[in-house]
Amino acid sequence: KELVADDEGRLRLKRFAGFEALIASTLDPQQLVPLQAILGNPSASAVATPGVCHMACEGGMEIFLLQGEYDDFLLSGDMYLEGKGKCGLVLRVNDQGDGYFLSLDFYKGLAQLRAWGHNPEGGHEGAFHYQPLQTANFLPTPEPHRFSLLAHGQYLELSLNDFVVLTLADDQFTQGRIGFYAEGAKLRVEGLTLNTYTTPTSPDYPETLAGL
């Protein structure tokens, strides 16, 4: 990461510029749609055109996945939230919803990353494995909320409005689908882009993450 000063003189973190050299391809937005809702919530709906996604779930929660499976990538776009419901991103998830869940509270300025998976031996009470990984605060700003979600090997990073908010290393999920979730909310994403990265091959990985 790189330490810079924002417009008000506050020190902020920006993504390591070296990631630009690792981009392997930029996907055509048409390859990312249509969206797939995987929880079967009857109150959920989604309409997507290349680069723009409209998602809604009036009651309960729904996960909306983009097309394709990815391991190392950078997903970017502008997010708009209608109402006071909850929303966020999911990454490296399977069709059952096991993977990483990133909740975003744009009103309180709170980002939370969790690992979420089914626990077949947990019975009714412990049917899901739920592990908080990291919580971070950020400065609430007016819309649009510009986001960039990066996954490279074990390294995961979220930037909002061009500044790094959350960063950690975790190896529970290494590949899967990417998307969004809405819970009692309407969500719109514009300018959606997806870059894929070359896979880490260094024998020192993930120790090399210390320099990012």
Role assignments for model-derived ranges:
Residues 1-212:
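Extracellular glycan-recognition regions
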